[in-house]
Amino acid sequence: MASDPRLPVVLLWHMHQPQYRDALTGRYVLPWTYLHAMKDYTDMAAHMEANPAARAVVNFTPVLLEQLEEISRRIAEHLRSGTPLPDPVLALLGPEPVPAEPAERLELLRACLKAQRKQMIERFGPYLELATLAETLGTAERVSYASDQLIHDLAVWYHLAWLGETVRRSDTFVSILTQQGRAFTAAQRRELLSLIGNLVASIVPRYRKLSERGQCELSVTPYGHPIIPLLLDFQSARDAVPNMPLPQHPSYPGGAERAQWHVRESMRVFKQAFGKEPGGCWPAEGAISRGTLELLDRAGFKWAATSANVLQGALARTDPKAARDSRAYNRPYRLPGGSMVEFFRDDTLSDLIGFTYATWHGDDAAHNLVNELAHLARQYAEAPSPESAGTGVGGDGPKRHAVLIALDGENAWEHYPFNGYYFLRALYSLLASHPLLELTTLSECVARGIEPLPLQTVMAGSWVHGTLATWMGDPAKNRAWDLLCEAKLAFDGVMASGTLDAARRAAAERQLALCESSDWFWWFGDYNPADAVSQFDSLYRRQLVVLYRLLGLPPPEELAQPISVGRGSPEHGGVMRRAYAT
């Protein structure tokens, strides 16, 4: 590393969607997996394909990889033999008539409006006209006036708006539909469905190819996206919030074994998809504890990544002077006696992409971010050495520092004009050619020997405010944990009895993993939007019901009752949160 004076810069895009399929019906309750595939996963691959000098780490969750495979397969089967499509909104592109039941028609009308208003609806005149009409007719009293053609046209525009910008600019058929505006035929809907199926099916092969040619490092999250520190120890939630109320159960039963299962299964699914084992891990929500890092180290990961606010909390306990020293950040660390290297993202720069730059001109935003990085490169290079500074963190920047910018790789872009097209194109171009910056990957940083500092203390926390309060502490969140604990105890009892055959045992174990996902707990709490809370609350309880049925047990009656009610209107609809509370 000493031979290259440039400051290493790593972009990490985290791709995740929880399991939206209802295992009892086979239908997807929410469409976000295939929509983000055709828009964001597609565009993010295309930007790297268009610029051979572009580099990034792309993190996939196994539960997302499995959904991509299933959805693409079921679309292909439908086109080949007419089998049902997995999603009710996607099914509007198929040959079946629009449901006649008024309640179903109303639900479909409303579903086709779930797109960012300014950038995805108002951008297209015909879609805005249809959306305005749908809003007028979107009541139980008026929905009967919504014709089948209106609903079909609205569904076509919904999917056109959710297409990646790189597809919109290159696909002739999409241009034809966009110019036509209305009165789409069944044949056109089928062709659009075929395009969507091809886009979803192409995601894994495209990223695998980018990895094989050295542009993209692929990493993984434990299988079901669980908050591993909480699986290991509920008390870890009090590490950053000492007085946090906890669930009634003292701990998650068998949590250590479940955490190990999620890690093992993630490596299996990842290898099946990409043909090799992952070198690095982004723990779900960047949530870590000492036990979490030790578990990932034992699993053989070369690196793990989380947030600087977690590092700041840890340093403040052991070395307050270092916690205030800017040179302590954008540095790799390692537990004493461990092998795995820990990277802590630059929260400020990451949140600029997630929450600020969407309102800027894309080129201006990219230049601003690169200027911030160049300033850091000069600052680190000019900093005094450890000996002259008299601290343990030192300067000698490019040889010791690496800036990680890590964030959700899918939800930010709908707030940008053109799905972030101009920003991302300019960002990759500027970073790849800057004389002070080296666009690279985390495994390359490890391989080149950037010297890690010792991580003497670990504060359990996440990239959201440096705490675990997003997933525990609220009464609804704690109740959800208690319901999960009770289901796990039932699971343990049935497994110990030996009454299930091997296939049923495996199905129950995977279903338990889906119930352990962090996503359900994220949405509980009255500060979240009502619709999202209702949907995720219902789906979580449904996942638990499926688990009980796989175990051959009657589901508890309380699973028929909502856990939480949302009343809030958070930034970005609550799907993303800043590193620091505002």
Regions found by a protein language model. Give the residues of each.
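Extended, H/D-rich, highly charged conserved domains that either
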Residues: T139, Y145, L150, L154-K209, ...
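Short, solvent-exposed turn/loop segments enriched in Gly/Ser/Thr/Pro and often Arg
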Residues: N59-L64, P222-H225, G280-I288, S443-V446
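Catalytic domains of cell-wall/extracellular-matrix polysaccharide-remodeling enzymes
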Residues: G255-P320, N411-H434, E438
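Acidic (Asp/Glu)-rich catalytic clusters
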Residues: E49-N51, R206-S219, A381
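Glycine-biased, low-complexity coil/linker segments
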Residues: A389-G392
